[in-house]
Amino acid sequence: MSEKIEGIIDDLLNLEENAHGIAIIGKDGKIITQTENWNISNDLDKLNEFLNEKLALGKKGITSLSIQGIKYMIVENTEERKIGTNITGKGHVVICPIPIGGTGALITYVNPRAGPRDVLFNVQEYAKKLTDLI
């Protein structure tokens, strides 16, 4: 992992106190990095399927996703962002495809006490910074 990517992750974690875990998937579908407290490797195939899914107009696509044994209901699925929330209060995930609509991603686990929209702007901005790096 490059120092630039590491710096971007550190900056996001310092800025966004409700981001409790971060992972980056490269455009090739492989994990580039993840924070020590969040391991997505066992869920990588499903995450890649989700990222590679191209929705036809009016179609729902994948409706739920499990990461580290926690099931998230997909509440928003657009080219810019994919948001999942655990209905039992175990947190949220914000997935920002890199580039927008692409197959890479910045994946963020969000504190259960916060809402996914609390971190959305910052996560999307930092995903844009990764576009030419992954």
UniProtKB/Swiss-Prot annotation:
Regulation: Inhibition of rabbit actin polymerization is reduced by phosphatidylinositol-(4,5)-P2(1,2-dipalmitoyl), a soluble form of the phospholipid phosphatidylinositol, suggesting an unknown lipid might regulate actin-profilin interaction in vivo.
A Pfam family it matches: Profilin
InterPro entries: PFN, PFN_sf
Record-level GO cellular component terms: cytoplasm; cytoskeleton
Subcellular location: Cytoplasm, Cytoskeleton
Function: Binds to actin and affects the structure of the cytoskeleton. At high concentrations inhibits spontaneous rabbit actin nucleation. This strongly suggests this archaea has a profilin-regulated actin system, and actin-type genes can be identified in this organism.
Domain notes: The Loki loop (specific to some members) becomes ordered on binding to rabbit actin.
Name of the protein in question: Loki profilin-1
